[in-house]
Amino acid sequence: MQTSPLLTQLMEALRCLPGVGPKSAQRMAFTLLQRDRSGGMRLAQALTRAMSEIGHCADCRTFTEQDVCNICTNPRRQENGQICVVESPADIYAIEQTGQFSGRYFVLMGHLSPLDGIGPDDIGLDRLEQRLESETLTEVILATNPTVEGEATANYIGELCAQYGVSASRIAHGVPVGGELEMVDGTTLSHSLAGRHKLIF
């Protein structure tokens, strides 16, 4: 079937989004053109500005349009003395929504993966080491994903922290709230049992 070259280009562009296949891209394109052209223009403008103006924070490496992000420049967070190490900026949003952390962050933009040729410098560990050396830190919280690569990355950073006398901790992981034990995989259940705590009455 022959379609407009611009329409084809739009559908192909939409497919760069995660989880968007040919049918989803087609539906999105037709919806924007048929029902919401003003929304499509807003989307185009927002994408253009974001792609050209959003960079990385000089301190924590998260996304920001400033040299240093609002979290890193917050005096209260600077005094906290804690840094939470995460794999992606999306992890910061997830942690911030809990309201349980009031320190600063460091974003790896990935994890160690020797098989893929991703080493310490590729995920900014040289910059993290500079912070360990120059800042007065009370704790580094390792919040990498509970995968083989995430665990290896956390262990590597933990050893790095020990070299500078900075306390390192790993976030707990285990059975999800509302989950049923019979549906939980063996590795997760093992972590839950190993990380159990006493009930205090």
Curated annotation (Swiss-Prot):
Keyword annotations: DNA damage, DNA recombination, DNA repair, Metal-binding, Zinc, Zinc-finger
Residue ranges covered by zinc fingers (C4-type): 57-72
Family membership: Belongs to the RecR family.
InterPro entries: DNA_Rcmb_RecR (IPR000093), Rcmb_RecR (IPR023627), Rcmb_RecR_Znf (IPR015967), TOPRIM_dom (IPR006171), TOPRIM_RecR (IPR034137)
Domain Toprim: residue ranges: 81-176
Protein's name according to its UniProt entry: Recombination protein RecR
Pfam families (UniProt xref): RecR_C (PF21175), RecR_HhH (PF21176), RecR_ZnF (PF02132), Toprim_4 (PF13662)
GO terms under biological process: DNA recombination; DNA repair
GO molecular function: DNA binding; zinc ion binding
Coiled coil: none
Keyword presence, Transit peptide: no
SMART domains, alphabetized: TOPRIM (SM00493)
Role played: May play a role in DNA repair. It seems to be involved in an RecBC-independent recombinational process of DNA repair. It may act with RecF and RecO.
